[in-house]
Amino acid sequence: MKTGKTLRAFIIATFSLYAIPLFAQKTPSLSDPEIASVALTANQVDVAYAKIAQEKSKDPNILEFAKTMTKDHEGVIAQAEALAQRLSLTPKDNAVSKQLNNDAEETKKTLNAKTDKDFDRAYIDNEVTYHKSVIATVEGVLIPQSKDAELKQFLQQVLPVLKTHLDHATMIQSQLPK
């Protein structure tokens, strides 16, 4: 019974990540401070997932991937914060960033409830889903709605990193037992 509830919660959390781009597209307009908040939040969320993986996984591929996620996303956060400071732009919470945080809390609970190979599978499945969703949101919402040229350029420069993460996660996913 508990496994069924946990799986259901994970599926709901994963599905809700796919809803983020759809939800964001229904947002009439995101200001640059709101876009900055979404970008920062998305990176902070993935760092949180990676830290859970670094604590729980024993799989060398998962551990290396999680270490890369932490390093890369913390680097993006530092760059985003520096850009925001340079542009005198204060990130502003909004429905999309709040939804990201709410979904992340559920996903973290689900990940923390898993162990061993079940954890590894849940983590990497989430990473694939999460990166697909974030890429779709950056391409379909954040870049088109960015007014500031530097912010738009920053988001465009982050996309290849996100796509590399997705490719890496997909490769690891294909190597894990079903």
For each feature predicted by the language model, list its residue ranges.
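Sec-dependent N-terminal signal peptides
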Residues: 12-14
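His/Met- and acidic-residue-enriched segments that coordinate or traffic transition-metal cofactors
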Residues: 2-9, 18-178
